[in-house]
Amino acid sequence: MTLGAAGAEEATGTAGPAAPEEVSGSTGTGTTGAGGGGGAMYVADADGGPRPPDWTRRPADAIRAAARPTGAVAVALRHGDLRAVVTYGSTSHHGGIPVTADTRFEIGSLTKTFTALLLAEQVARGEAAYGDPLARFLPPEALPRPRGGPITLLHLATHTSGLPRLPPGLLGSAAADWFSNPYAHFSTADLLRALARTRPRARPGERVRYSNFGVGLLGHLLTRAASGGRQGYGDLLAARVLGPLGLSRTSCGPDLPQATGYWHGRARPPWLIPGLAGAGAVRSSARDLLGLLDAVLDATPDVPSGAPHGSAPSVPVPVTLRTALVDMVRPRLSLHDGGKRLALIWNIRVRADGDVYHHSGGTRGFSAFAGFSPRHRTALVALTNASPAAGQAFIQGAYNALLSLARPD
């Protein structure tokens, strides 16, 4: 089941999340708008009009070549103080409108990076601690069967909880909508019932095992930490992260227009994942996701990174969120081969010329990638409306393009 073009980040055993294989591989109307971090952003439609900036053409075209010929593609790039969004195609295979920097795509497991930031923000506020056990937020009857010590929030955010990839009972509820919306009928109540009948596959902290179950649970626990569960994940994320960063095209539901997703070439309905929202519910745009990465790279932004030109509110980003942006990317685990680490959710590829952070995602119809290099102040976002097979090549192409940017000038 797809919740993430996860070849880029899934892990089993003790090896941890693997980067995509490092294989070699290698724009319309241009307008100037506001980008993150205080610099101008160039926006170009690659299917006609002025040429995109030269520095974007090779990575953006390589990503486009890895996508389906009829697909919608949006690529956002940052290199130092240079920013651009390059778009290709239309929002559907049969007409639609041209893709723009603000076209919304489902981002699947990239949602987990937002959940990581929300966790770090709540820790900075003092509402939660990384070492908090599940028992702080859940009644005894909802806890999983014990195996070793208690599962903590940090275990959930580093895929070391021992929980399986998917909750027990999910496959049964997904049968009727397997090819379109497999998570649509799995509720928060189902999540808690599944947790109570789960025995972890390993002792907490012992092994890295990629788990949608675990991060979906984390998203729910954060709502309990903030409001006793009265506020849903989407509303909490909007209040604590999306609003303060000015990410106005990002949300957890199909409340705004979005591109049409295609799975094996067939149009799919909007993705619904009510019970595991923190693992895969977010929709976003290339501009907004680059704004998020700008905020991470710049660490202490004075105004929201993703806000359109002229609309940034005068209220500074809260101190707790600034703290969280730094804390989220601090390495937490060093994996046994020495070449990979884990932050909160983010995978880290250790490189002599500067570490690269990355994550990918996918739904029944979309594939997404985001990554950045703090040393080189480089970031890349790639979004397309196709999955699954094309998504793997697309994710690999995006990862390779990020590596090509994250090099000394």
Q: Which residues are covered by each model-predicted region?
A:
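Catalytic tyrosine of NAD(P)H-dependent dehydrogenase/reductases that use a Tyr as the general acid/base
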Residues: 105-108, 208-210
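Active-site SXXK
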Residues: 63, 81, 106-134, 215-225, ...
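Intrinsically disordered, low-complexity terminal tails and inter-domain linkers enriched
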Residues: 2-47, 298-317
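Short, well-ordered beta-strand elements
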Residues: 84-87, 358-359, 368-386
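Short, glycine/proline-biased beta-turn/loop segments that scaffold the active-site neighborhood
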Residues: 129-144, 245
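Short, gly/Ser/Thr-rich active-site loops of penicillin-recognizing serine hydrolases
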Residues: 42, 331-340, 385-409
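Short, surface-exposed loop or secondary-structure junction motifs
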Residues: 82-85, 145-364
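Short, conserved catalytic-motif segment at the N-terminal edge
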Residues: 51-107, 127-129, 354
